[in-house]
């Protein structure tokens, strides 16, 4: 890490007195979701991140240069760093070894206002103790002050007490190995790629820190060394290399500044795509919902380009570039590091510190205007792209105004004519089904509860918005009815408070065409109405694949395995299993039972756990470049089941 950061971290003594205790650990095993969000595979990987984050905090303090993560044959994971280790003495308040306090007492750590850490991602201080509580066992080896200290825990309890194992020479740092408790987690097998993605982010965000990820499981042996001296500049280059588009200027624009104990970094580069990719972090934690640092960046970006364009005569009179205009094709990383980070939730998804907005705004305004003055050719390329986006946005605005005017003159509702609306007016109680084709839509209209279920049949070809600007979106006969029906607008006009339905359910056939429609609609929502996904409004209906029946006995199967199970249950002989080729084959009663009735249907909620991965996947699947799409299909075809081709 750079000397500037080390100086601002104000390294001071890190000893036993700086471990502060806030409360006990009793509730973690009973209510794990309160501490790690979920006991699904996402929560499982969260355990790894909690331990690694402690090592990253050592790196932020300038005390750690290398972190080794190993997935072992028994699906345990070890994390080893060369930081300072944990203070080896006794905690005066509890009369216990400090190491034991860190792993058995909730909210015990050196990150609550003492001088052990000036900047830390582990704000809530639950990491080590929660991992201990939710693991079958944890083993810790602490190297500090020339001695090696060890302790073993099982399900949060001390199994082998704290003890000194002898001298360790010059070695320093912490080794933690844990095995998640199978009675807590739905899944206990770690995914290498999931951990790799997170560790790559951490390596980019902490320039110079080496992270080595190793998988020792039989048949899966591999190792990745992550070490990026370029920091977030390398991060932007990496993102643009992942098929988001071709950069329109050679070098990544890098800006950095500080105030007090706060440091802000921004790296950005434009490509020839129509989408924006802004990824933000606070103390190395991904802030997927944005926050004050993103707001400051966007405000300054728009101001800087407008100021430059006016100063150079590119913009005349009252002409203005909007935020959407200047962000088209942008790939940007925003990373802030600060003391007393205020997040708006335990999940740390949105930063709330108002002073960070001011800091980022100031840095970007000053540094970006300097860059534009010093690089007029690059400035011209970027502004020309923004002007093209502006013209497309203006064309879209005129198309919207024309459509509204036509509706008023013709005396018709702005709701699409094909929409079979529901009676309930309170949005949170309602749902709308986006149904493939008129034939399926006809059955769907009959097989619904019209009190709260609306049906919108899709007609025409859904536009691939990955390759289109906003004016093309407003000219698409399939997307316009969706925009009208939902009522909340898109892009900069989006207002989630105007959403007319609580659930938006995509319902398409289980064939290639149906899959294509689903990905086209998801791309549209992700690019133009992303808060719908972020706030849990978008769902995928899961209609059955088979009807299994014998006489009057009927079962619906959602997989081949379930089909075989029902055939066996019904006696085998004389049982018929019919594959549904499309939604139109179901009568209204069957549609109600399998896809509409809340007590029997299956819905998949669409969520964004990793914004970078989502962005990359949509770019690969729906972008112009064929080769990365071919690679993706080749790598993921093995995961596809029950698709009619």
Descriptions of predicted regions:
Residues 30-49:
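Conserved short strand/loop->alpha-helix "switch" segment adjacent to the catalytic nucleotide/phosphoryl-transfer site
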Residues 61-63, 88-91, 445, 517:
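Conserved ATPase-coupling elements of RecA-like P-loop NTPase cores
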Residues 391-411, 426-431, 442, 446-448, ...:
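C-terminal interaction appendages of subunits in large macromolecular complexes
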Residues 1-18, 25, 49, 57-59, ...:
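GHKL-family ATPase ATP-binding module
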Residues 72, 79-83, 87, 506-518:
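Catalytic palm subdomain of template-directed nucleic-acid polymerases
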Residues 86-109:
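Short conserved segment of the HATPase_c
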């Amino acid at each position: 890490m750079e000397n500037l950061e080390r100086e601002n971290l104000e390294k001071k003594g890190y000893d036993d007195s700086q471990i502060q205790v806030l409360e006990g650990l009793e509730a973690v095993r009973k209510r794990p979701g309160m501490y790690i969000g979920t006991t699904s595979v996402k929560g499982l990987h969260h355990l790894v991140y909690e331990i690694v984050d402690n090592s990253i905090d050592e790196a932020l303090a300038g005390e750690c240069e290398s972190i080794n993560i190993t997935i072992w044959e028994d699906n345990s994971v070890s994390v080893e760093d060369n930081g300072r280790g944990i203070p080896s003495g006794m905690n005066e308040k509890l009369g216990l070894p400090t190491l034991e306090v860190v792993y058995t007492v909730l909210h015990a750590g050196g990150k609550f206002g003492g001088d052990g850490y000036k900047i830390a991602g582990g704000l809530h201080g639950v990491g080590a103790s929660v991992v201990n509580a939710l693991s079958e066992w944890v083993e810790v080896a602490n190297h500090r002050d020339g001695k090696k200290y060890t302790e073993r825990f099982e399900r949060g309890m001390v199994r082998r007490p704290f003890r000194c194992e002898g001298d360790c020479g010059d070695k320093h740092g912490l080794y933690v190995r844990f095995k998640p408790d199978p009675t807590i987690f739905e899944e206990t097998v770690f995914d290498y790629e999931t951990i790799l993605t997170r560790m790559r982010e951490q390596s980019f965000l902490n320039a110079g820190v080496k992270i080595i990820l190793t998988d020792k499981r039989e048949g899966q042996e591999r190792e990745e060394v992550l070490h990026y001296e370029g920091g977030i500049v390398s991060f932007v280059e990496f993102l643009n290399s992942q098929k988001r588009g071709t950069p329109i200027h050679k070098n990544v624009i890098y800006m950095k500044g500080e105030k007090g104990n706060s440091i802000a970094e921004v790296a950005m580069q434009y490509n020839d795509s129509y989408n924006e990719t802004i990824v933000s972090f606070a103390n190395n934690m991904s802030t997927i919902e944005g926050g004050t640092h993103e707001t400051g960046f966007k405000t300054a970006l728009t101001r800087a380009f407008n100021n430059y364009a006016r100063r150079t005569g590119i913009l005349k009179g009252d002409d203005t570039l909007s935020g959407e205009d200047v962000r088209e094709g942008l790939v940007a990383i925003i990373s802030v590091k600060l003391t007393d980070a205020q997040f708006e939730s335990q999940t740390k998804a949105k930063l709330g510190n108002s002073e960070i907005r001011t800091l980022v705004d100031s840095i970007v305004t000053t540094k970006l205007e300097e860059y534009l003055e010093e690089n007029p050719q690059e400035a011209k390329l970027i502004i020309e792209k923004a002007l093209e986006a502006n013209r497309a946005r203006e064309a879209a605005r005129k198309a919207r105004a024309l459509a509204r005017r036509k509706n008023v003159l013709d005396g018709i509702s702005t709701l699409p004519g094909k929409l079979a609306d529901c009676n309930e007016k309170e949005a949170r109680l309602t749902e709308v089904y986006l149904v493939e084709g008129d034939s399926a839509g006809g059955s769907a209209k009959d097989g619904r509860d019209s009190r709260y279920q609306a049906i919108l049949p899709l007609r025409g070809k859904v536009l691939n918005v990955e390759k289109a600007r906003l004016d093309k979106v407003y000219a698409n006969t399939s997307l316009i009815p969706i925009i009208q029906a939902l009522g909340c607008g898109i892009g900069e006009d989006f207002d989630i408070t105007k959403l007319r339905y609580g659930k938006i359910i995509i319902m398409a056939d289980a064939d290639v065409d149906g899959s294509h429609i689903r990905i086209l609609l998801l791309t549209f929502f992700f690019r133009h109405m992303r808060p719908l996904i972020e706030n849990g409004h978008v769902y995928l209906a899961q209609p059955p694949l088979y009807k299994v029946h014998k006489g009057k006995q009927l079962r619906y199967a959602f997989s081949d395995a379930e089909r075989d199970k029902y055939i066996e249950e019904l006696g085998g002989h004389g049982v018929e299993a019919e594959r549904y080729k499309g939604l139109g084959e179901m009568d209204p009663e069957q549609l109600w039972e399998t896809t509409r009735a809340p007590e029997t249907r299956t819905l998949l909620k669409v969520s964004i756990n990793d914004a970078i991965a989502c962005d990359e996947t949509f770019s690969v699947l729906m972008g112009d470049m064929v080769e990365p799409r071919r690679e993706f299909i080749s790598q993921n075809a093995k995961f596809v089941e029950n698709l009619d081709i």
